[in-house]
Amino acid sequence: MTNQYSILFKQEQAHDDAIWSVAWGSNKKENSETVVTGSLDDLVKVWKWRDEKLDLQWSLEGHQLGVVSVDISHTLPIAASSSLDAHIRLWDLENGKQIKSIDAGPVDAWTLAFSPDSQYLATGTHVGKVNIFGVESGKKEYSLDTRGKFILSIAYSPDGKYLASGAIDGIINIFDIATGKLLHTLEGHAMPIRSLTFSPDSQLLVTASDDGYIKIYDVQHANLAGTLSGHASWVLNVAFCPDDTHFVSSSSDKSVKVWDVGTRTCVHTFFDHQDQVWGVKYNGNGSKIVSVGDDQEIHIYDCPI
């Protein structure tokens, strides 16, 4: 337990190229936590976080091109990765073996996300569709069509009701998952939406854009509830803290910022990376943040809780 923000651990040369994505899960059996990273070096790496340090568990080979997105199942020891090779791969975190490879088709799979029940994997495509794959079947179950541009980012709401997508032209779409209907189209940004994240109570959606702004939306009414500035360049990633009170952002200005949801203010900035920071995530209880970037490093920070 700590009462201030500080950098706790640095893994230098974690990959041989830029690290574009990170996920954080917990291993209940071993009382340890798992960090998964995806890099332009074509590798997915699985790290164990225990005793305040990272140990490399598996280096997963299979992708033919850079890995752009990783996620960890909420229910099983499985990770998913998507790559510029247009394949999604599922990995067993307990033995480091590939479970299956899914051909995402001629349109690149970009960001991917497990559904809250982890039975599905959603991924955005170049043609404005969100494709939903069955984790068990490995097949495309259905698509949601934004009728828009290349989808860079997607997120499920934790309550399983909504799926949000962010496109290269700054348009955000929110779908009702049960009906497949498009509920809201939000036009708050004029530049690519790199990342979006729902609050744990599914009431708010936070969006990150190349315009340098972070926006907070009230999901139910699609109202803009806040515009936050502070990053000096593109905002590349946002992730909510499990306690609903804070979220974290990362940017090509090389910084990681922690924001207070209630006051809409930045409460801490980390300047520890040497290059743009592509990915940030909280751990399960919100006591730690992980960040990854073009400097090939993984950083773990302590948060006051």
Swiss-Prot record:
GO biological process, one term: transcription elongation by RNA polymerase II
Keyword Cytoplasm included in the entry's annotation: yes
UniProt xrefs under SMART domains: WD40 (SM00320)
GO cellular component: Cdc73/Paf1 complex; cytoplasm; euchromatin; nucleus; Ski complex
Keywords recorded for this protein, A-Z: Acetylation, Cytoplasm, Nucleus, Repeat, Transcription, Transcription regulation, WD repeat, Wnt signaling pathway
Primary subcellular site in the record, as a coarse category: nucleus
Pfam family, any one: WD40
WD repeats: 14-57, 62-101, 104-143, 146-187, 188-227, 230-269, 272-305
Modified residues (N-acetylthreonine): T2
CDD domains (alphabetical): WD40
Family: Belongs to the SKI8 family.
Subunit details: Component of the PAF1 complex, which consists of CDC73, PAF1, LEO1, CTR9, RTF1 and SKIC8. The PAF1 complex interacts with PHF5A. Within the PAF1 complex interacts directly with PHF5A. Component of the SKI complex which consists of SKIC2, SKIC3 and SKIC8.
Entry protein name: Superkiller complex protein 8
Species annotation: Bos taurus (Bovine)
